[in-house]
Amino acid sequence: MPPSSPSLTKVNKPASTVIAKQNDEREKLFLLYESSGTTAGDDSAAAANMQSQRLSDVDTNCIDHYGFIHEKPLTTMSVNERKQIQNEIKRSERWQKMLQKWTQLTRQSEQLRRRIYKGIPSSLRGAFWSKLLNLDEQLRIHKGHYELLKTKARLTSTYLVQIDLDVHRTYRNHQMFCNRYCLRQKHLFSILAAYSVYNTEIGYCQIVAFLLLYLPEEETFWALSQLITKAPYTTFGFFVPSFPKLFRFQEHFEKIMKKMLPKVYKHFNQYQLESNLFTIRWFMLCYLDCLPFELVLRIWDIYMLDGEQVLLTMAYCILKINRKKLIHLKTFDNLNTFLKNELRQNFGNTTLTYDEIIEELNVCHDKLKQNNLLHLPPLKENEFLTRLEL
């Protein structure tokens, strides 16, 4: 008879050993970001110069107006593009004057609303987002809290490995994030780490790198906090595990489609395309990576002003503008590809300019309002944040 196999006994490591290993992993990650790449220096200076940063190993002809790096040199600017840049410079002068008299304005100011719907100039986008999110007040109220949260994250956050993985793959085609452990990667890691211990019900979310394109580090942290917890944004319900706000928005959008776009709604049903397949990213990320970047910026300008309403209005606007193309697509795969890929590349090959799309967005807003479809049902109980850690 062959000898019996020896029994294997699992030996559990002492809790103190596991904790020590976790502490070491956290410390190593923080040290990587602290010791590599560009040192932080004066963050206000970094923010002021962020639009002019260039990388020595990248042909500047491959970098577009927004800082994204392309494989091939970009074509020479057309006469219209040069004219557009000149117009933006002139607009910036008017916006700068408006910034100086900010205390005299309200969110409902006709001048402010009209100009925001035309798009905030890139050079002043961060300054106006900061004003619309009331970040000066947040920095004053929470003075010193962000540094304390970073220290706490260094000692206790359980999300750091996942955060590091996300930082590694985020916006690597952008001049601010393309070098591993560079300044903006360090800021992104620090903000996500701090937020993971500040709002333990969510941990962290994926819009931070986009905000960092236009805001300095600490302002970005409090911008994230405002967007998640404060009206008219209150995105908390999009990110908690049961996604209550996402489902509420998707249910309401079904009503909008049934009433305002019945042919599109029927067509989608015919090919078993449910709207929740494409609206999940539209609503949770406010169209980030879902539409051309320049158009996304225009939508975010309006989102900073009006909040969550633009999520539904833009969804309706997208389908309304593209309704004829959608109805001519005769398979699930073709419909899904159009909504997930073609819209992101060129808004479905529309002949409309971005200004015209935003004008149509305004029209869609008024139509939803006329049909009592602009306002959603009230928040559900599980959409409210119960605690923040300070």
Per-segment meaning from a language model:
Residues 173-181, 192-197, 250, 261-286, ...:
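Active-site-adjacent structural elements in folded domains
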Residues 117, 304-305:
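Solenoid-like repeat scaffolds
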Residues 189-194, 206-213, 222-226, 255, ...:
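Contiguous, well-ordered alpha-helical segments that form the cores/surfaces of helical PPI scaffolds
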Residues 121, 216-217, 291-295:
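Helix N-cap / loop-to-helix initiation motif
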Residues 136, 215, 231-235:
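A generic secondary-structure signal for well-formed alpha-helical elements
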Residues 1-196, 212, 378-390:
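N-terminal transition regions in large eukaryotic proteins
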Residues 84-90, 103-104, 111, 221, ...:
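Extended, Lys/Glu/Leu-rich amphipathic alpha-helical scaffolds
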